[in-house]
Design a protein with these regions (language model features):
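Bacterial Sec-dependent N-terminal signal peptides
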Residues: 1-24
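Beta-rich carbohydrate-recognition and catalytic domains
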Residues: 22-155
């Protein structure tokens, strides 16, 4: 019995070992990038702010400052994955604007169109997040943070 278990173990090692060398993950050879979770290719990343699954693809949004390796005006970065292992960076999802930086939040796929944003049969992806106005904060105003919505009909 032990020999059968050992033989099965060896066969499994051979099978799985042969597929490991065929990985197309570009981060495999990058010394300082983690292999077990997403990181952008460069610059500041902060907390994850929304993960949704839509049409066979996972979408991850995260606080991101694309211009430096230190904290700065927050954006929402975007990455996609078919399997939660292999990630592809996408263009930035949300940029700072006249209302301020893009802080923490969440995202949902609005299948039932409770937001009313659907158009021509396209299902909206709705992001709910905090706008942070650094000028208002410096001035001591009490309304320097506001809740905001953004949506997309892109697929």
């Amino acid at each position: 019995m032990k020999r059968k278990i050992f033989a099965c173990f060896i066969v499994m090692q051979i099978i799985t070992g042969s597929s490991i060398g065929q990985s197309t993950d570009t981060t495999i050879g990058e010394e300082y990038r983690p292999k077990a979770h997403f990181t952008p290719a460069a610059h500041w990343i902060n907390d994850p702010n929304g993960m949704v699954y839509y049409k066979g693809v996972y979408h991850l949004f995260f606080q991101y400052y694309p211009d430096s390796t230190v904290w700065g005006p927050m954006h929402w970065g975007h990455a996609t994955s078919p399997d939660l292992i292999h990630w592809k960076e996408q263009p930035i999802a949300l940029y700072p604007d006249s209302l301020g930086y893009i802080f923490s939040g969440s995202a949902v796929v609005d299948y039932k169109n409770t937001s009313g944003f659907a158009k021509n049969g396209k299902i909206p992806l709705v992001a709910i997040f905090t706008h942070h106005d650094p000028k208002g904060e410096k001035e001591g105003r009490d309304n320097y943070q506001n809740q905001s919505l953004a949506y997309s009909l892109d697929e």
